[in-house]
Amino acid sequence: MKDGRNSFVATNSSRSTNKHFVLVHGGCLGAWCWYKLTPLLKSAGHRVTVLDLAGSGINSKQVNDLRSFSDYIHPFMEFMEYSVPGGISAKPEEKVILVGHSLGGLVISKAMETFPEKISVAVFVTALMPNITEEIDISDVVNEGSTGDSIYTYDEGVKDKPTTFICGPDYMSSTLYNLSPPEDIALAIMLMRPVRLYSMKDMLKEIAISKQKYGSVKRNFQCSIIEKDPTDEVKEITGSDHMVMISQPQQLFVCLQEIAEKA
């Protein structure tokens, strides 16, 4: 973010010192984007899981294989279902802290609705966060004309809406990584992969949220959304861009540590 501020969301539950963090990347990225934050969390005694969503990072799926949002988030949802304890036998300290960045906010929102009993805290890092009372609108996130040299494909014809998107180098340097080290920008340009642009109809169907489940996991978000949907805690990181885990990993770690201590 060019204004140098980033915000998160948090909820409360168990009170064990060492937590299990699950880090979920945004569109066009992969698990690799957490490489600075992961060792910081581990050095504090936390367990950390980083996942590649389908068609991202080193995941073998290709973007055109992912016909629905469920296909895209399948590796993460499978992990939440089978690798995170749940049910009446689960201990409070086994709950996870979810951290979603950018598009990853919608991914962890799906988990909050599906597995609320497995989550102690949900953290939205410059991320999309659904509002219980309003429809999701991501049209302004990847609108053509607002993303510079980014590339769109039209697999269903140029008269239809674009089907995939990948960040362009200039757009990344000027908007997403504008306060990040140049070597990290170079690395990201090499590792970017296209993300599928799902229709609003598909997104609304896939991320149907309720106050009883999704709403039971306390949350927070960026300034423009907080006004519409007041939430629980906001933390701001100065001197950061959209890629806060790259530009200000130490400050992000401190914020997450504070959240973990309250959880």
Regions found by a protein language model. Give the residues of each.
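Short alpha-helix in the alpha/beta-hydrolase fold that links the catalytic acid
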Residues: 203-205, 222-225
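Catalytic active-site module of serine/aspartate enzymes centered on a nucleophile-bearing elbow/loop
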Residues: 8, 19, 230-263
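Flexible "cap/lid" loop of the alpha/beta hydrolase fold
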Residues: 113-165, 200-203
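Gly/Ala-rich beta-loop-alpha elbow adjacent to hydrolase catalytic centers
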Residues: 99-104, 108
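Active-site loop/oxyanion-hole signature of alpha/beta-hydrolase fold enzymes
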Residues: 47, 55-97, 110-118, 136-146
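Active-site nucleophile elbow and catalytic-triad environment of alpha/beta-hydrolase enzymes
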Residues: 187-215
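Conserved HGGG/HGGXW glycine-rich cap/lid loop of the alpha/beta-hydrolase fold
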Residues: 13-60, 94, 114, 118
